[in-house]
Amino acid sequence: MSETKITRRAFAQVSAGAAALALAGGAAFALADAEGSEEGEADEAEPAEDDATAEEGVVDAKGREVAVPESIERIAVTCMGGGTQTVCTFGGADRLVVSPSMAKSAPLLLKIFPQIEDAVDAGTFDDVNIETIAAAEPDFCFVSSTSDKGNAAIEELGIPTYTLSTANATVESMRNDYINTSILLGTPELGEAYTAFWDEIMGAVADAAKTVPEDGRLVVYRCGAEITAANHTPWAGTWIEAVGGVSAAENGTTGDVSVEQVAEWNPDVILTSGDIEALLADDRIQDIAAIKNGAVYAAPKGTMGWDAPSPEVPLGFAWLGAQLYPEAFSGIDVEAECVAFYKNFYGYDLTDEELDDIFKRA
């Protein structure tokens, strides 16, 4: 199993009172006491960050009050793989009838929730096939905050929608999305257990980040496969800064930048979605601090990557904190938390090999 830099006890304490909730395959499993990545192009919408629930419904990422149906039996998702992962996490796998193809290309997600394979692909965001959606006869659809045009077309079919934060996510809006999804899907106990997990991990992350001295904060650059492919989305800034890092580029900086610009930023750490060894060997950037020190990392990938909004993202915060500040974050055992999360929320026992695969890119 791969060695991580986090070696002490974990913080998550998931309540056993949320036991026997139906998840994958319609089977119930007990939530035992446990100890222990799709960013689209963001638009200007501001995700709702106030109370997750309204008097007669829930409030989505667009600030709309969405009525809670008596039941939801046929679910459509049109916001990449993370939306499907969210639905599965909160008990909706058996009810999926429409899901983007990206979810089917996530091996571990598909292994845990094989029901995804039977859902039809109707596209994503604004590029959706309305005829395919209509033919699947969903009675509810989870959509993205970045796709007003596609969402409106779905609503014209008379299908109620809930807008997930996706690329516009903040820490608070994501937490609200997951609470609300559990309410909509009729699994509020699972939502309560999840928020207990979230609050413990994110609280531990915040506490650890506070111990990082101002003059010891590391500058972090996030890129694609090439060093010149900047990928400092707003979410990347949230991720980096929440653990005590400093974003090298202004949040929202994406696309081509020059090697000279990266050299001027001179990041202490580089996060990449590409090949780590290729970046370390790039002759153009050998004088950059991160390259000199071998501080180039790629986020772990579970059912989805840990560097993008998804239910596994608290694990991503803890992991990144440990890469930047191993001593400050030594109190969170990320591997143990990952195993507990999969058991408690997916009803799935990770093998040692699967756990190693999740962390192997890091």
Where are these predicted regions, by residue range?
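A short, structured surface patch at a secondary-structure boundary
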Residues: 77-136, 140-142, 146
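Proline-aspartate-enriched helix->loop->beta-strand connector
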Residues: 130-143, 259-274
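Extracytoplasmic substrate-binding proteins
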Residues: 54-58, 65, 150-226, 249-250, ...
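Alpha-helical, coiled-coil/dimerization segments enriched in small aliphatic residues
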Residues: 231-254
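N-terminal secretory signal peptides and thylakoid transit peptides that target proteins
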Residues: 2-19
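C-terminal segment of N-terminal export signals and the immediately downstream linker at the start
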Residues: 27-57
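Short helix-initiation/N-cap motifs at beta->coil->alpha
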Residues: 61-63, 119-131, 252-260
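Structural recognition of the beta-strand scaffold that forms the well-ordered cores
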Residues: 76-78, 97-100, 140-144, 162-164, ...
